[in-house]
Swiss-Prot record:
Residues recorded as bearing N6-(pyridoxal phosphate)lysine in the entry: K257
Cofactor(s) needed: pyridoxal 5'-phosphate
Statement: the UniProt record of this protein carries the keyword Transferase: yes
Pfam families: Aminotran_3
Chief localization: cytoplasm
Role noted for this protein: Catalyzes the interconversion of ornithine to glutamate semialdehyde.
Protein's name in the database: Ornithine aminotransferase
Gene Ontology cellular component list: cytoplasm
Organism for this UniProt entry: Bordetella pertussis (strain Tohama I / ATCC BAA-589 / NCTC 13251)
Length: 411
């Protein structure tokens, strides 16, 4: 029988909360490093990292200390006034990424919307595209956020169904299909928005050489290449930005999530004078964007990533995790990914991935399913080889006991 407190909590959530999520049936109360703890004190290995927002691990003490210190001094001024934390964040991001202009926002979706506004305005004012005719190319199975503007160019029926009419000006092409991208370009194309690795689609990597072709095309046709690194960036793939694996540089880079280490919503648009210089006072803004608390937290989160070798660890442990995953028994169709952004796709007859997530949860491991048959595996970047070995033991048990023809669920 569920405890009375749990029953009351569930009833309140059901009655008062909007039902736009379907979480696993665990109630978490505490986190530390790679571990999460439920209200009964049971421990779980976090293999989602809040969609890569807690790359540095839960409740990292250095980020927490920076947040508390700044919260005791100054939290919010709005951008109506200057404050002493903004310039240092600009310098840190410029040094780490090579960006010449930085525009801080809050959520990842806000950063995406900001970039879309900037490139449209750039297209009209710098490229001379006729007013109201700018086109932006995006990819099928994309995920860039949940705002009305963004879901308008989603191809996910759940994400876009029932929300129209949508803004015009977006062309959808298959991810990784350079010929399709090339054919979609017109004189009115101002930008190509793309994820280096499609996360929500199931950790889908592009074909080798694809992004070098994309970079060349965008340069030749004066098209702004926007890389959405909100999930792939900040060490997740074993490089500070995933573009490094492709040997290219985007014109606009979007970062967020782990930019705060999970403590606070912080995102940023990184670009150059040509694109971000297009905004004049009053043409774009955000009350909380670039606030003192956000800047202090982001700077600490960036320092922790580098000082503690987390990016190198993601590369090394990611390669080891991939090797172990490929050796797993059971109904595994494919293992793919880069660094610690990994996915295990099940065979079509293996049953829904969510059932495997539920069985893994019962064994102390929290994993998120996506697109029906795929398990996403993205632990914090501090994960150790021993913890990976333990995770693979749980996966092996669940896969072996859940395969078609097996005796049923795990013991």
């Amino acid at each position: 029988m569920p405890a009375p407190a749990a029953t009351r909590r569930d009833r309140i959530e059901d009655e008062l909360g909007a039902h736009n999520y379907q979480p696993l049936d665990v109630v978490l109360a505490r986190g530390s490093g790679v571990w999460l703890y439920d209200t009964a004190g049971r421990r779980y290995l976090d293999c989602l990292s809040a969609y890569s927002a807690v790359n540095q691990g839960h409740c990292h003490p250095r980020i927490l200390a920076a947040m508390v210190e700044q919260a005791q001094r100054l939290t919010l001024t709005s951008r109506a006034f200057r404050h002493d934390q903004l310039a240092p964040l600009y310098e840190d991001l410029a040094r780490l990424t090579g960006a010449h202009k930085v525009l801080p926002m809050n959520s990842g979706a806000e950063a995406v919307e900001t970039a879309l506004k900037a490139v449209r305005k750039w297209g009209y004012e710098a490229r001379g595209v006729p007013a109201g005719q700018a086109e932006i190319i995006v990819c099928a199975n994309n995920f860039h956020g949940r705002t009305l503007g963004i879901v308008g160019f989603s191809t996910d029926p759940d994400a876009r169904g029932g929300y129209g009419p949508f803004a015009p000006g977006f062309t959808v092409v298959p991810f990784g299909d350079f010929a399709a991208l090339q054919a979609a370009v017109t004189p009115r194309t101002v930008a190509f928005l793309v994820e280096p690795i499609q996360g929500e689609a199931g950790v889908i990597l592009p074909p080798p050489g694809y992004f070098r072709q994309v970079r060349k095309l965008c340069s030749e046709r004066d098209i702004v290449l926007i890389l959405d690194e909100i999930q792939t960036g900040l060490g997740r793939t074993g490089a500070f930005l995933a573009e490094a694996h492709e040997g290219i540089e985007a014109d606009v880079t979007l970062i967020g999530k782990a930019l705060s280490g999970g403590f606070y919503p912080v995102s940023a648009v990184l670009s150059n004078q040509a694109v971000l210089g297009i905004f004049q006072p009053g043409q774009h803004g955000s009350t909380f964007g670039g606030n003192p608390l956000a800047c202090a937290v982001a700077r600490a989160a960036l320092r922790v990533l580098h000082d503690e070798g987390m990016i190198d660890n993601a590369r090394e442990q990611g390669a080891y995790f991939m090797q172990r995953l490929r050796a797993l028994p059971g109904p595994v169709r494919e293992v793919r990914g880069r660094g610690l952004m990994l996915a295990l796709e099940l065979e079509p007859d293996a049953g829904p991935a969510r059932a495997y997530c539920e069985r893994l949860m019962a064994r102390g491991m929290l994993v998120k399913d996506t697109h029906g048959q795929t398990l996403r595996l993205s632990p914090p970047l501090i994960v150790t080889r021993e913890q990976i070995d333990w995770a693979c033991a749980q996966l092996a048990h669940v896969l072996a006991h859940s395969a078609p023809g097996s005796s049923g669920g795990p013991s």
